[in-house]
Amino acid sequence: LKDLRFNMAYVRGAIGRIELVESGAYHFAIGSQFAVEHEIQCGREIEAVFNFGVGSYLSKHVLLLRDHGKNGITEGMRVAYDSESLDQSCLTTNIVKGKKVELVNMRTQQTITALLDGNIDAGVWNYDDVLENHCLDDLKVVFLTESEYNEKFSTAVMVIRKNNKYLKKILEKNISVSKTLEILSDVCK
């Protein structure tokens, strides 16, 4: 895309990004494969142009616990729940299924502070941030089981408005998935 002029913006939540693409305000957006497929099944007028593969969105999600003596979600816990984040809300719902917990509605970005301040007991988080951020050493990291986690949450997908053949051709001509993954790998080193 070096020969094309375009702007980039951060928009919180895949649903918001998808709505902006669908409305024509944005030409394309990145979201998790899970969120994109969910929104397409819900009738959104979008389509996936590129799938960047497992681990391209983030390496994986984990469960963070305030109490190091716990190994997972237990009855009575207060658990972070971001109703505006499709990935986080679906993961959280799956993890707490069948347990009597209190879902505490908050932005995903507030999870760490809420855990450290004792306002919640557990929350879903990005494992890449755990590896980079040493203030998280005070929290217990629990890896999610196969039944709790789907690789589609960690897979980046580029979406455009449905049937925008002109834009699709431009993107396919100018974006290489392998080159993008090479750059991503270099950035992560």
Predicted regions and their residues:
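Bilobed "Venus flytrap"/periplasmic-binding protein-like clamshell domains
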Residues: 1-2, 58-111, 164-169, 182-187
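Short helices/loops that flank or line small-molecule/ion binding pockets
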Residues: 15-29, 94-95, 109-123, 127-128
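Hydrophobic beta-strand segments of well-ordered beta-sheets in folded domains
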Residues: 27-28, 72-80, 100-102, 119-123, ...
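Periplasmic-binding protein-like
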Residues: 46-67, 128-183
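Contiguous, function-dense segments enriched for cysteine-driven chemistry
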Residues: 5-8, 19-22, 28-31, 116-119, ...
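General small-molecule cofactor/ligand-binding pocket signal
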Residues: 7-11, 102-106, 142
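A ligand-binding cleft/hinge motif common to bilobed small-molecule-binding domains
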Residues: 30-43, 113-150
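Short, glycine-/small- and polar/acidic-enriched structural segments
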Residues: 2-65
